[in-house]
């Protein structure tokens, strides 16, 4: 895929899942099999030197998860694929070329899964604030695709971190040095 083949960032996922505006029946052949957390993670997973926000401005307005789209760079110093299996899942981290920030994107297919990652890519002896954008506990592309939880925790390169990905879900993290 080239940098312009796929544009992530859809927040209005549900409107694409129904037969029509008047018929609110979920049509499994007419939807985005994704979640907002996965849409954010795709900004890291898919390399694209030119990024854009693919949804309508009113769907981003006032949404706290839009901050990740504002923060994620397009120029990277380093890229590491931490884990994955073609067609199933992937976790990628990238270091911003203009700062000490790292960005993580982890996505899965229609199967939910848990992946454990070591944070050895972070600088030694430094503490990081991790701003995490994740699907809710019972989320997924069929259930709560537009819900996203945002939390902040402190982590170091000696830590490991467990990522829980519901069906069609994802997780995006920004690591900033304290």
Cite the ranges covered by each PLM segment:
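Short, glycine-/Ser/Thr-/acidic-enriched flexible segments
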Residues: 11, 50-52, 98, 109-111, ...
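Conserved, mostly hydrophobic/aromatic
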Residues: 45, 104, 168
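Glycan-recognition and catalytic regions of carbohydrate-active enzymes
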Residues: 55-103, 138-146
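C-terminal beta-strand-rich structural cap/linker in extracellular carbohydrate-active enzymes
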Residues: 152-178
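Solvent-exposed beta-strand/loop surfaces of large extracellular or lumenal domains
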Residues: 132-158
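Glycan-recognition surfaces
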Residues: 1-57, 83, 96
């Amino acid at each position: 895929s080239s940098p312009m083949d796929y544009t992530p960032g859809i927040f209005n996922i549900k409107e694409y899942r129904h037969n029509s505006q008047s018929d609110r029946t979920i049509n499994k052949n007419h939807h985005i099999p994704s979640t907002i957390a996965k849409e954010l993670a795709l900004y890291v997973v898919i390399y694209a030197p030119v990024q854009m926000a693919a949804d309508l401005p009113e769907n981003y307005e006032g949404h706290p998860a839009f901050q990740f789209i504002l923060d994620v760079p397009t120029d990277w110093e380093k890229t590491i694929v931490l884990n994955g299996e073609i067609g199933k899942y992937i976790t990628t981290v990238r270091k911003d070329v203009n700062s000490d920030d790292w960005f993580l994107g982890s996505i899965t297919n229609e199967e939910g899964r848990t992946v454990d990652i070591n944070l050895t890519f972070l600088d030694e002896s430094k503490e990081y604030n991790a701003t995490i954008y994740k699907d809710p506990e019972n989320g997924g592309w069929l259930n709560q695709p537009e819900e996203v939880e945002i939390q902040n925790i402190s982590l170091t390169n000696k830590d490991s971190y467990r990522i829980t990905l519901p069906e069609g879900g994802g997780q995006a993290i920004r690591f900033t040095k304290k």
